[in-house]
Amino acid sequence: MRVLGLETSCDETGVALYDSERGLLADALFSQIDLHRVYGGVVPELASRDHVKRMLPLIRQVLDESGCTPADIDAIAYTAGPGLVGALLVGASCAQAMAFAWGVPAVGVHHMEGHLLAPMLEEQPPRFPFVALLVSGGHTQLVRVDGIGRYQLLGESVDDAAGEAFDKTAKLIGLGYPGGPEIARLAERGTPGRFVFPRPMTDRPGLDFSFSGLKTFTLNTWQRCVEAGDDSEQTRCDIALAFQTAVVETLLIKCRRALKQTGLKNLVIAGGVSANQALRSGLEKMLGEMKGQVFYARPRFCTDNGAMIAYAGCQRLLAGQHDGPAISVQPRWPMESLPAV
């Protein structure tokens, strides 16, 4: 089965073609970072308009690169949520229109399920069951995964997601957008131990997260430095390192708890923050000590992309699941409500 995947949940337009027997045939992505950078964050209306502009050229590019024509497409998968409603509607409308014109089924895919399954595109994919850490701009969750659609939420952020905290903190200390890569870049030049930030909610039982207080702690630290006349680039680097270390160690502590609680040895990390090298290194060391294994997608499949949507959609289509012709999206959509495959 050849499935065309469309991703338009936020500020990246992704298109990919996945073959159930041959794997990923082609993928293309357009990032709107430059469009939104001047505003310091994503502007939903601009995101939707740019998806409209980019979608068809990217589809043509993927078809050309794969050597396929519309007649070779067996189904279409699209991100149906969660995400920005206008952006989601662009992808859903395009998918349903092409499905009708080409006479093929369409299926809406949960954006975070796409992220969770992205490591399945690698040469050594994880095997069920495993614990998944989903870390992105909109989500920070620990999930027990027993199969596709068989998800048990173990813990989640009660306020800011980890990726959101990175972006907001970067803005507070005068860094550019997107904040995650900026903080990671500065942290490489930071002085270890100059600042020590708290590890939120690690002093109590449970698997939930909270990063809002850490963001405020970082701002207060920066403001004290500025008032003391120490707003140098090195101070920014030192604060960036302290913040990143606090977030990473908080995630590590919670992941260790989740693995011990479930008795599982394999961990999947997915979502945009999973590309952070400090997080990857920390988890690899921890899982090595626990005689387990950590899995993640290649960096370009950590952020939003069409390949993960094509793959996730293909699994549900092979199980006989597909949508009717109505155009419907779900800006808020709990992943544990998905049917099992």
UniProtKB/Swiss-Prot annotation:
Its main location: cytoplasm. GO terms for biological process: tRNA threonylcarbamoyladenosine modification. Fe cation binds at residues 111, 115, 304. Keywords: Acyltransferase, Cytoplasm, Iron, Metal-binding, Transferase, tRNA processing. Binds 1 Fe(2+) ion per subunit. It comes from the Bacteria. Substrate binds at residues 134-138, 167, 180, 276. Belongs to the KAE1 / TsaD family. This is tRNA N6-adenosine threonylcarbamoyltransferase. It comes from Pseudomonas aeruginosa (strain ATCC 15692 / DSM 22644 / CIP 104116 / JCM 14847 / LMG 12228 / 1C / PRS 101 / PAO1). The lineage of its organism: Bacteria, Pseudomonadati, Pseudomonadota, Gammaproteobacteria, Pseudomonadales. The gene is tsaD.
